[in-house]
């Protein structure tokens, strides 16, 4: 697989789209939120798929994320990404649900845009329907089949 820094792409996408919210709180908040969401996604994936996803990253990012691995939790769903976003932002009472959803959606969609087709297909097989839909992975399967 050709290396691609999907983590940095997700961070940049979140930061550019939600700069007014993130910068008002902390200039490193996009990096923190992205890291927390990445760890959640990796925890949801089987070890082989998570390892392949981590393998696409530069060594520094790989080391940070691979430390968080170690379990495969099939109970993690889309609402967990929303909750993780809210609590990662640091002020649960100030963050609107729509903003948290938009940040989580941006993260998930950006990753699916940046990874190779082979990994998209694996993730489409491994993830529940709602996460697949948020990542546009259902379309990936249909496109590949056509």
What are these regions (language model features)?
Residues 1-146:
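General marker for long, soluble alpha-helical cores
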């Amino acid at each position: 697989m050709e290396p691609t820094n999907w983590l940095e792409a997700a961070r940049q996408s979140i930061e550019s789209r939600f700069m007014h919210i993130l910068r008002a709180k902390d200039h490193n908040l996009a990096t923190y939120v992205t890291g927390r969401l990445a760890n959640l996604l990796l925890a949801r994936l089987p070890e082989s798929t998570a390892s392949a996803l981590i393998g696409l990253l530069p060594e520094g990012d790989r080391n940070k994320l691979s430390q968080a691995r170690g379990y495969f939790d099939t109970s993690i769903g889309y609402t967990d990404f929303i909750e993780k976003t809210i609590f990662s932002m640091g002020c649960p009472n100030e963050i609107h649900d729509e903003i948290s959803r938009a940040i989580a959606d941006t993260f998930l969609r950006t990753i699916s845009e940046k990874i190779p087709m082979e990994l998209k297909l694996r993730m489409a097989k491994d993830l529940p329907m709602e996460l697949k839909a948020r990542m546009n992975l259902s379309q990936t399967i249909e496109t590949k089949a056509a």
